[in-house]
Amino acid sequence: GLPKLPDNQYKMPDDLLAVCTVLHEEAGEGTVRVVFEPDFNLIVRQYDASFELVLDRDMVLTYQGSNTVSTDALTEQEIEDETKILQIITQMDLSLDQKEFYRSLREMNAEYIVLSSSSAAVSYVETAGCIPVREVEGHIIFRVEEK
């Protein structure tokens, strides 16, 4: 069966808990590699360590303007791919070629993307070839197909 999820002692947002539950239902057992929006990305592993974050925590913080962290642990290719993914999911620049975006997802071995339903990136991600799997608590979970 699925692992029993820990009690919500971290006071995680209910919508994040619901998303985590659905991701486990979809993915089955084992670790799941997920692209989360920055706010979820920074907290999800405190609640559930079976998620592998596609976006490195320090990369997200650097992207958001922090200069107290370092991305030295990442390769140039990882930084490039993660930057492309971030610029889409944060709706900063939706002009990136969708094939490029998809290639970066595949490079980073992303299995799922979770976006806020109201995000301007939703239609971009869908057009790029990600499959919307479920909508839950104001978020859409997309599966990244192996092409």
Language-model segments: residues:
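Extracytoplasmic
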Residues: G1-K147
